[in-house]
Regions:
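An amphipathic, aromatic/His-enriched active-site/gating alpha helix that lines ligand/cofactor pockets
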Residues: 61, 74-105
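Exposed, tryptophan/tyrosine-rich binding patches on extracellular proteins
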Residues: 71
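Short S/T/G/P-rich N-terminal loop/turn motif that feeds into the first structured element of a domain
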Residues: 1-64, 104-156
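Glycine/Thr-rich phosphate-binding loops that ligate phosphate moieties of nucleotide
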Residues: 67
Length: 156
């Protein structure tokens, strides 16, 4: 059975969209997505335009930056996240993003049989589940990861 992995990320810009730091973030972000597309491992990128965001994603300082993408598998997603330009962007994220609330993860990952089952609504549900119950096969992070059958695995 073919299974894909979805990742939902949540960040909050420190500055307005017009601020040079934010403009730099969008340039870097576009480049990172171009690189992701080139790998052949990125299956789908969802647009955040006209999405009704949940209250917890929008309240607070700074504008929310949310991404939702689907990948071929967990290993390729993990490798992409911690290499190349994306790794560089992670190192510089404090320039662009404010710090996260206690216990609020800035991303959540889950397995899906069908790309068509992935949606923003689904992402918000998985994120809430992670906040309430911690990492589980339903919603997890790279530190506490699960394989497609729900077994704990170590990513490296």
């Amino acid at each position: 059975m073919m299974a894909f992995v979805a990742i939902y990320t949540v960040g909050r810009l420190k500055h307005s969209h017009e601020h040079p730091a934010s403009r730099e973030f969008f340039e870097v972000g576009n480049e990172v997505i171009r690189q992701a597309a080139k790998t052949g491992d990125l299956i789908k990128e969802f647009s955040p335009n006209r999405v009704l965001f949940p209250e917890n994603a929008i309240k607070g300082e700074g504008s929310p930056i949310l991404t939702l993408t689907v990948w071929k598998n967990l290993q390729t997603l993990f490798r992409f996240t911690y290499s190349g330009q994306h790794m560089q962007a992670l190192r510089e994220r404090n320039k662009w993003f404010g710090s996260h609330q206690e216990r609020q993860p800035n991303y959540v990952v889950w397995w899906t049989e069908k790309v068509t089952d992935v949606s923003w609504k689904e992402a918000f549900k998985r994120y809430d589940s992670y906040i309430q119950h911690g990492p589980a096969p339903f919603a997890f992070d790279f530190k506490s990861a699960f394989d497609h059958s729900g077994e704990k695995i170590l990513l490296k």
